[in-house]
């Protein structure tokens, strides 16, 4: 039984399951040309999710207070990680003001006094990392990913993608991770079929 400790001493248990082959990532050439310095990674863990984690929410509330004190609404998109993703959106022909990066959207909610959605411990943790870092972080149930390779490319016209809580999302021109079945995540939203 392994445990992951949160910065303030909180913890969530991580239980090993049968050894699964880690997914590999292939970056399409057209994407790599626009984002040559891109660095990505995959972290895999067998976890037991819970409805809420009070100590995690203490960290989330602290980070929300820090964001609200440090930024005005029109300054959020100047954070380097958010700015880099917005630049990629523009390079692929997508308007980052219409299709916001999830980390930017979360920070904007905080500044407007709306807070962060409370979903469950795993999603809440991912949202904290996203808000703190400025990067859009995807979290997927590995058992729902088809195949051994994820492909990072650009959304195509007419490509079907059902964003979590958003319905059908036009991902043409958005960076998108795909498995053997289709899109599973963009920096704006993850796909319904791969949620935990």
Question: Which role does the model predict for each range below?
Answer:
Residues 1-2, 165:
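A residue-level detector for conformationally permissive "hinge/kink" positions
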């Amino acid at each position: 039984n392994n445990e992951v400790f949160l910065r303030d001493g909180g913890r969530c248990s991580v239980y090993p399951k049968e050894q699964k082959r880690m997914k590999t990532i292939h970056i399409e050439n057209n994407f790599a040309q626009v984002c040559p310095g891109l660095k990505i990674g995959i972290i895999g863990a067998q976890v037991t999710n819970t409805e809420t984690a009070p100590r995690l929410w203490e960290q989330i509330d602290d980070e929300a207070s820090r964001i609200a004190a440090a930024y005005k609404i029109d300054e959020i998109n100047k954070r380097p990680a958010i700015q880099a993703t917005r630049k990629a959106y523009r390079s692929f022909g997508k308007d980052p003001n219409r299709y916001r990066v999830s980390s930017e959207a979360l920070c904007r909610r905080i500044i407007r006094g709306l807070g962060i959605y409370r979903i469950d411990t795993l999603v809440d943790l991912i949202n904290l990392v996203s808000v703190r870092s400025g990067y859009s972080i995807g979290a997927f149930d590995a058992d729902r990913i088809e195949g051994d390779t994820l492909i990072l490319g650009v959304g195509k016209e007419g490509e079907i993608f059902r964003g979590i809580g958003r319905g059908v999302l036009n991902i043409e021109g958005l960076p998108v991770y795909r498995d053997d079945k289709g899109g599973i995540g963009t920096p704006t939203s993850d796909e319904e079929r791969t949620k935990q």
